[in-house]
């Protein structure tokens, strides 16, 4: 069952994702005439940034959330962004034959548990010599925060809502990802886990981040209990990992960064 994303909430609480995506984009040697695919485009702001770098090219953003696609289309209309388009699509079922010079994906693919069909579709969609640049949650991502959540869902007050809960994210190691790239016919150029420091200015910002992205957990709960669950998680995390001297809260994130080429 697809998650019910709230684009405006995500837009306000995804500054870290935007910064990390722009860091990766800055490493790509974009000529300006490429045809680009952005997998998991979300609210569209990163896709629009890419479009601004393509005066003679174009970019297609796809997402499996119809809410996100509608939001992106309304925020970045074709009348103002003629080289930018958005489409509802599932990353596990790509049928875009050799259309793209470049495929990117940021803070999205960890929502997919089996990446093998995704990589097969990416290979199919790239032109020969085309490249993939992706960054998403990797093995150990937000581990300290997950520890708090996992303890909480075992509490007697919350356990009945999670009795059959399975870990919903695909956080993988570099080794297994290199193997999958090879199986899909893609040549790995760089695959590595990198550490990032996600900084939230205060408790409310941390709570908003959880509200916008921890949907597999929150959607298990009645709506009237979600704020309480978020509050208990945030307070538990801050108790174990106090804010710094400026009151900012830090969450250690692990991202898997992937660069590959279609031979």
What are these regions (language model features)?
Residues 1-34, 45-49, 68-71:
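Conserved class I S-adenosyl-L-methionine
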Residues 37-39, 43-93:
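Class I SAM-dependent methyltransferase SAM/SAH-binding core
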Residues 92-103:
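A short acidic, Gly/Pro-enriched loop at the edge of an enzyme's catalytic core
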Residues 102-115:
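A short SAM/SAH-binding and catalytic strip from SAM-dependent methyltransferases
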Residues 112-113, 126-128:
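Helix-to-beta-strand junctions that scaffold the AdoMet/dcAdoMet cofactor pocket
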Residues 116, 131-201:
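Conserved catalytic/acceptor-binding region of the Class I
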Residues 188-245:
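C-terminal helical/coil "lid" or tail adjacent to the Rossmann-like core of SAM-dependent
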Residues 208, 255-263:
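Core SAM-dependent methyltransferase catalytic element
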